[in-house]
Amino acid sequence: MTILYDEGQQAIATESRRVLEARTSTEALLPLLESVGEYHRPFWDTAKEQGWTALALPEAHDGLGLGLIELGLIAHQAGRSLSGAPFLTSGFGAAKAIELYGSDAQKARWLSALASGDSIGAIAFAAGPDTLPAQPDVTFTDDRLSGTARGVSGGLAGNVAIVLANGPGMPVLALVDLTGVERTPVPSFDNSRCVANLTFADATAETLAVGTTAHDAALHIL
């Protein structure tokens, strides 16, 4: 399928490519692939400065109110330049989950912070090789999370995570502040992805969605 970009979208692609070519280099990025636990902070600072972290978030929460096409154009250029940072997991995955399923209080707490790039979001859905498990490894009971979410991209850098958990008789999509959560670095082929195991020990969490809605929400975000 051919996608025809309008003039504004073409300008986003051209300008983001120009900026990234000027501010990134292979020499600067290669060490990040081998160093566990660090993402490309110059790229993240650039994303904040250029408003890319706010691109697809609603204007009511300090976003730019654009869509997935524009976000995809930036992500394409970031990938082209090998910029390593949790760009899509934060600016789309976590942010979109809160925008679509969060309460007014949850939106007020997190969306502006994600739009500014001052907070980073992570997505914790997988269990082993299963990207969207029927029985997640993490359990949700009485607004508490227990268990370990493994291989979470952006987990080392994140301030907030959206977790697919096993609730009482049904799946739960939960929001958790990662302050105080144990994080174990996981070496990967690209260590700038800041992959970590997140261990929850009765961590306070908030509900975003339950039952089939939780499953459908997770599928939509993926």
Model-identified regions with their sequence ranges:
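Amphipathic, small/basic residue-rich leader segments at the start of a protein or domain
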Residues: M1-A85
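Predominant activation on well-ordered alpha-helical scaffold segments within soluble catalytic domains
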Residues: R17, D45, G72-H76, A95-E99, ...
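FAD-binding glycine-rich core of flavoenzymes that anchor FAD
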Residues: S81-L82, Y101-G121
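N-terminal glycine-rich flavin-associated loop
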Residues: A85-D104
